[in-house]
Amino acid sequence: AGRFDGRVRVNVLEIAGGSDLAERFQQSGTATAAPGTVMVIDEGNAGHLKVSDAAYDTKVAGIVSGAGDVQAGLTLEQEGVLEGDLTVAIAGRVYAQCEAHSGSIQPGDLLTTSSVAGHCMKATERTLAAGAIIGKAMTGLKSGQGLVLVLVSLQ
């Protein structure tokens, strides 16, 4: 491990310690944001995120990294300016808390926020889904609640 102050340039960089691209954020609200929790932009606190609690929320921002023992591969932060305690995946593969009450989730399904706090669900209403997609399911969930591997690709 090391710390470099200044510019580092490489031709190829392979990261073998995780599989998502994350940023650190400050969290608003009192809800617990455990690994796998779906987060949305907090309109009342610039730059902060809060636990999602509404279906088809266009403020969807990412998923807290670390669920299913999959850690962030690369974490971005600007010390003293844009920093926080919550590591949130904004791209790549990460496990998310999902619910299948609106329909079973299959690999390839588009996912959006759910009314169940901190969870995502299968996007079945295409008109509501525009701008509210967090990514695509890579594993399934037939019923109930559980972890689903998600390819995060905000849309």
Task: Label the model's feature ranges.
Residues 1-155:
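Extracellular receptor-binding modules and their adjoining Ser/Thr/Gly/Asp/Asn-rich linkers
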